[in-house]
């Protein structure tokens, strides 16, 4: 049985979309993220400037954003989405210089961040209709309500690892997609 079966049952019984249900539970706006294997006919990669994925999630509250490797300016997100292979050392050096942690520690942190096994053709952010992952920025009270929903639906406590390294792209969205569990 998948970890999310109990939660999916709760969502089905609510008779509304997962996005709407989670918005009602947490009081926050949720954004869908869809990993596309092929670019659809309605693909509109019109983002003028390259953007960080975490910024796109925030901006998607105003409308859908379609992303490709060349429209994401963050190498961490490109790595998490499987678009950047064999470039960990670039990220390690950047992290070490930016934070002051040793290269060895930076390497450990970078290598722990999940990566999509099969790179996607594009990432659609903002549309909840066919979302692979739902994401939001929550306040503490909303986070507590969400965790309580998880515990009630699954009968288990939520165990999470939290990291500031590629926090939204890799350690939240890709990790949730791979594990089929809540990531923070």
Regions found by a protein language model. Give the residues of each.
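Acidic, serine/proline-rich low-complexity intrinsically disordered regions
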Residues: 2-184
């Amino acid at each position: 049985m998948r970890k999310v079966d109990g939660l999916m049952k709760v969502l089905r019984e609510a008779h509304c979309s997962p996005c709407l249900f989670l918005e009602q539970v947490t009081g926050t706006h949720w954004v869908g993220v869809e990993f596309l294997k092929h670019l659809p006919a309605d693909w509109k990669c019109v983002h003028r400037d390259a953007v960080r994925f975490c910024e796109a999630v925030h901006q998607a509250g105003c409308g859908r954003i379609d992303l490709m490797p060349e429209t994401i300016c963050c190498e961490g997100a490109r790595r998490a989405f499987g678009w950047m292979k064999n470039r960990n050392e670039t990220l390690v050096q950047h992290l070490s210089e930016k934070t002051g942690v040793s290269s060895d520690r930076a390497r450990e942190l970078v290598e722990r961040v999940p990566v999509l096994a099969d790179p996607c053709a594009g990432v659609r952010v903002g549309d909840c209709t066919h979302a692979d992952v739902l994401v939001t920025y929550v306040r503490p009270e909303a986070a507590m309500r969400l965790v309580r929903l998880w515990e009630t639906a699954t009968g288990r406590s939520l165990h999470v690892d939290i990291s500031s390294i590629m926090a939204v792209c890799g350690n939240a969205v890709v990790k949730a997609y791979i594990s089929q569990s809540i990531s923070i």
